[in-house]
């Protein structure tokens, strides 16, 4: 006869057994609103949750530093601007609102892939600029050569010397438009594609260009006065 190990007799342990009570995990969570800068018409982006472990716990410390991406079409209500996404970082908590500050921008992958053309020259440039509050941003710009009506060849390649001149134009435009500006103005220029239009206008004097746009903006170093640089609606 096999010997049962201690505790295996369920009938004998029924009297002292404890019931496993199901705990609703969502009852310990609190919801907060995610808000973008007030320069956008629809600055309430969504909600985020945080787990509350005790009544004395400061939940703001758990929320500060969280990042979220929002499509520009959702921020402005214009569906034609769906190819651009802005990144924000929670820098302050006011009541139930998480105030986000600019943390970067990038184009969607399908838009970036659609810029490239076969038998054309792709010109890329990246440059670091310093904003008004000391934030260091790395800006990436792309441009593609354009076929003119008088061109008979299917290959539209520019010379290396022309490519260097166009890249120099990109550097100058990035520095002229963004250097020393506050983050609100930088976001407005990125949303309106001011840099891409200026690069296409000035660079086309060297060689015809198309699809000139800022594909990415990366935050290399955050400034000290980021919270004061952003004017956010409290309500």
From Swiss-Prot:
Q: Which GO terms describe its cellular component?
A: cytosolic small ribosomal subunit
Q: Name one GO molecular function term.
A: structural constituent of ribosome
Task: Write down which residues bear the modification named N-acetylalanine.
Answer: 2
Q: Name one GO biological process term.
A: translation
Please provide the record's keywords in A-Z order: Acetylation, Cytoplasm, Ribonucleoprotein, Ribosomal protein
The portions of this protein that span the membrane are none
Query: InterPro entries, alphabetically?
Result: Ribosomal_eS1, Ribosomal_eS1_euk
A Pfam family hit: Ribosomal_S3Ae
Instruction: State the source organism's domain of life.
Output: Eukaryota
Q: Mind telling me which HAMAP family this protein's record contains?
A: Ribosomal_eS1_euk
Task: Cite the record's note on assembly.
Answer: Component of the small ribosomal subunit. Mature ribosomes consist of a small (40S) and a large (60S) subunit. The 40S subunit contains about 33 different proteins and 1 molecule of RNA (18S). The 60S subunit contains about 49 different proteins and 3 molecules of RNA (25S, 5.8S and 5S).
Q: Which family does the entry's similarity section mention?
A: Belongs to the eukaryotic ribosomal protein eS1 family.
Query: What protein am I looking at?
Result: Small ribosomal subunit protein eS1
Its lineage opens with:
Eukaryota, Fungi, Fungi incertae sedis, Microsporidia, Nosematidae
């Amino acid at each position: 006869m096999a010997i049962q190990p201690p505790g295996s007799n369920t009938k004998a342990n029924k009297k002292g057994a404890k019931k496993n009570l199901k705990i609703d995990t969502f009852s310990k969570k609190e919801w907060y609103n995610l808000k973008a800068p007030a320069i956008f018409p629809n600055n309430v982006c969504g909600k985020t949750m945080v787990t509350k472990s005790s009544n004395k716990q400061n939940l703001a410390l758990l929320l500060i530093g969280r990042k979220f991406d929002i499509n520009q079409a959702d921020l402005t209500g214009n569906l034609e601007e769906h190819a651009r996404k802005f990144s924000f970082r929670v820098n302050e908590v006011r009541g139930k609102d998480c105030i986000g500050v600019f943390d970067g921008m990038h184009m969607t992958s399908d838009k970036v892939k659609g810029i490239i053309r076969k038998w054309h020259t792709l010109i890329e440039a990246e440059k670091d600029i310093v904003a008004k509050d000391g934030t260091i941003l790395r800006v990436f710009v792309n441009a593609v050569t354009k076929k003119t009506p008088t061109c008979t060849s299917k290959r539209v390649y520019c010379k290396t010397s022309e490519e260097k001149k166009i890249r120099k134009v990109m550097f100058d435009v990035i520095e002229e438009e963004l250097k020393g500006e506050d983050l609100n103005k930088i976001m407005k220029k990125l949303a309106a594609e001011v840099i891409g239009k200026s690069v296409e206008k000035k660079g086309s004097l060297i060689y015809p260009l198309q699809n000139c746009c800022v594909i990415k903006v990366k935050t290399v170093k955050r400034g000290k006065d980021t919270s004061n640089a952003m004017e956010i609606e409290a309500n």
